[in-house]
Amino acid sequence: MNDVKDVTAKSIAEDWYSSFENDEKGKTEHNDVLKSLQGATILVYEFNCYSYEEDSFCLFRKNGKLFETYGTHCSCYGFEGQWNPVETSWEELLSRKYYGDETVQKAVANAYLLDSGVDTTWTQ
């Protein structure tokens, strides 16, 4: 699980579009990520790299609303055209089954608790 305190809009944009930085469309999409995250609070960011594929999930709050976006690709292509934040809710996020990705499910649940002001400190 990534620690979001170290995640910036720039680092997310680089994860998604660094391999296309010399391509005009890649530059445009890189800038789209930066614009959509301007003034946002990143709540969850997962970026996974496997042998021949990558996937990413981003949950953020902007102007009091929750947004999420998800992308995946194989080694042949990148995340082109997949950065598409959609408005969501805690109810939607918590009811969803994240098949095969427990880290995202745990990160969403933890972000919900923190966002709700629940004390997540564990004591014996």
Predicted regions and their residues:
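Acidic, low-complexity, intrinsically disordered interaction modules
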Residues: 49-56, 61-85
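N-terminal domain-onset segments
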Residues: 1-51, 81-124
